[in-house]
Design a protein with these regions (language model features):
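All-alpha prenyltransferase/terpene-synthase fold signal
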Residues: 1-294
Length: 294
C-alpha cells in the first residue's frame, strides 16, 4: 500500500533540497547528505496519507511543501537532540556534532528552523500557524522534561507519557492534521486526523522504547539499552523498577556501565516487562484506529 507514496516522498526530498539551498556550499552539501542518509519518513507518509481526506490533486503543491516543512522540523530537532545528548551516531550514521562540532551542528539546526518559519509564512491558514506554534513550543518543553528527568527515580508513568507526548506525538499529530487542513478536508476529518496522529505517535514512541531493549543493535543501528545508558528512564525501565526496585538502588549519574548493563539484561530478558510495554502501546494504537472510525 505504501509503495504508491514512494514517488511523492521523493518529490518531498527534492523540494527540501530546493527550499534549504543557500549560498554556502558546505551547508548545502551537509544538508543534502543528511537528508539523503535514509530514514522511515514516517511523518511525511502520514501527512501524505491524511491529505487524501480532502482534495489532494488541487492542493498537491502546498501538500508537498508542508510535508517538507514537517520533515525539516523533525530533522532539526534530531540535530539539536544529538548535540544535547553528545551523541556520536544516529541509526548507524555519524552525527553532525561528532563530525563537524557542536557549533556547526547547532547552526545547521537553527538554519533549518529558520527555513521552516520562512516557508510556513506562505500559508494563509491561521490553524496551520497555531498548530505549528504549539508544536514547536511542546518540542522544546519535551526536551527540557527529558533533561530534567535523567536518572530521576521519582519518574512516574504519567511523567513518561507527558514527555513522549511532547517529544514525539505532538509532531506526528501536526503532520496528520496539517495534511488534512491543507487538502481542504471537512472539520470533523481534520479533528479526527489530529487525534489519530497523537495516539499513533504515542504508540510509535512506546514501540521505539520497547525496541531499545527487545530489538537488535544491527536492526536499530544503535546499541541495546542506549536510552538507559544515557540515563533516560523509558517505559520498560519504569515497569522494571516497579517489579524490582532494588535493581535501581545505584541508578544515578555516577553509576558505571557494568551496573547499567545488569539492568539492561534484566529488562531485555524479562518477557513480562516487554509484553506489558507492548500492551500499553497497543492501547494507544487502538485509540488511533478508533479515531479514524469516528
Amino acid at each position: 500500500m505504501l509503495k504508491q507514496y514512494d514517488e511523492l516522498v521523493q518529490e518531498v526530498l527534492e523540494d527540501i533540497f530546493v527550499i534549504t539551498k543557500s549560498e554556502d556550499e558546505k551547508l548545502n552539501q551537509v544538508i543534502k547528505k543528511y537528508f539523503s542518509a535514509g530514514g522511515k519518513r514516517v511523518r511525511v507518509l502520514l501527512l501524505l496519507i491524511c491529505s487524501k481526506l480532502g482534495d489532494f490533486n488541487n492542493n498537491k503543491k502546498n501538500i508537498i511543501r508542508m510535508a517538507s516543512i514537517v520533515e525539516i522540523i523533525h530533522t532539526a530537532s534530531l540535530i539539536h537532540d544529538d548535540i544535547i545528548d553528545k551523541a556520536e551516531t544516529r541509526r548507524g550514521n555519524i552525527t553532525l556534532n561528532k563530525e563537524f562540532g557542536d557549533e556547526f551542528a547547532l547552526l545547521v539546526g537553527d538554519y533549518l528552523f529558520s527555513i521552516v518559519l520562512r516557508e510556513v509564512s506562505e500559508f494563509e491558514n491561521e490553524f496551520i500557524h497555531s498548530y505549528l506554534a504549539t508544536t514547536l513550543k511542546e518540542l522544546c518543553i519535551g526536551e527540557l522534561i527529558q533533561e530534567d528527568g535523567l536518572y530521576n527515580l521519582n519518574t512516574r508513568r504519567l511523567d513518561y507519557l507527558r514527555k513522549i507526548k511532547r517529544k514525539t506525538a505532538i509532531l506526528i499529530a501536526f503532520a496528520t492534521v496539517s495534511g488534512s487542513i491543507i487538502s481542504g478536508a471537512k472539520k470533523e476529518d481534520v479533528d479526527s486526523s489530529y487525534r489519530f496522529g497523537y495516539y499513533l505517535g504515542m504508540s510509535y514512541q512506546i514501540i521505539d522504547d520497547y525496541l531499545d531493549f527487545a530489538g537488535g543493535a544491527t536492526s536499530l543501528g544503535k546499541e541495546i539499552g542506549q536510552d538507559l545508558v544515557n540515563g533516560n528512564i523509558t517505559l520498560p525501565a519504569l515497569i522494571a523498577k516497579e517489579k524490582n526496585e532494588n535493581l535501581f538502588l545505584d541508578f544515578n549519574r555516577s553509576i558505571n556501565l557494568e551496573k547499567k548493563n545488569v539492568i539492561i539484561d534484566y529488562i531485555k530478558n524479562n518477557k513480562d516487562i516487554l509484553d506489558e510495554t507492548l500492551s500499553i502501546s497497543q492501547r494507544y494504537l487502538d485509540k488511533a484506529e478508533n479515531s479514524i472510525a469516528e
